Amino acid sequence: MKRTLELLQNGGTGFLPESKPHGWVRLMFENWNSLGIGTQSWKLDRLNYLITHLRIDIIAGCESQCNWTMVDTNSQFLALLAPGKATKGVAAHNKTERIQKDQAGGTAIVGIGRICDNISCMGEDHTGLGRWSWLRLGKGTTSTRIISAYLPHKPGHNSRGCTVWEQQSRYFEAKGDLRYPSTIFTEHLLDLISTCIAHGEHILLAIDANQDVYSGRLAQRLREPPFNITCMLEDATGETVPNSHFSGSRKISTIFGSKGIV
């Protein structure tokens, strides 16, 4: 996170807008690569700084890397986020296993401040694996489902069984499904999105997909009917999505959205 701020402030990809037009909703998404609950408080300090400085309304993220059942009440995500402001949301993790406190994976999405009054419901991945979390803004004929998700990638040969991929493999293999966790993830997520669209909801999907956000399998499926969902960052910034890590060469994280939201 520190490196990202340095790049942005020194002319890197994108910009840090300090003002927000009236009536706009600002959504922030990041792969935290561990929030460092109990070990790296600077990450939450910096996150809270950005929330205030950029007037963030909804924070979404993945790889929180915390089993929230193993930390006390004062260390829960909503208790640490945006002190003094109203918050409403979900921090999800794999509840099907009790591995360790700094458990790989996890997703979260939280509304901050006045936007909380517009959150009609919220939830998480029905399997209990924490693959995604979501909230819905509005209700009736005008509502938007905002999903924060993490699509796992296959680990190397030296992994020790604790990766997100391996956690999900164990869960589905126990149910007789031997497909790749990434394949199952895509199927389940598209089922959820299809149901939301059928109920008239708009979609925002903030995701670390671990595959190209233009040519990857998920991106290709999202462009097709009935989804018609595309990457929104290009429309918002006029530029293609940058590499998702300052030292990387892959575009794997973005925010997809229904047409007409921006």
What are these regions (language model features)?
Residues 46-96, 163-261:
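Metal-dependent phosphoesterases centered on the DNase I-like endonuclease/exonuclease/phosphatase
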Residues 65-154, 255:
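Structured beta-strand-rich core segments of catalytic domains in phosphoester-bond hydrolases
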Residues 23, 54, 103-104, 250:
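Short, basic and Ser/Thr-rich N-terminal targeting/leader segments
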Residues 1-45, 113-226, 262:
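Active-site regions of metal-assisted phosphoester/phosphodiester hydrolases
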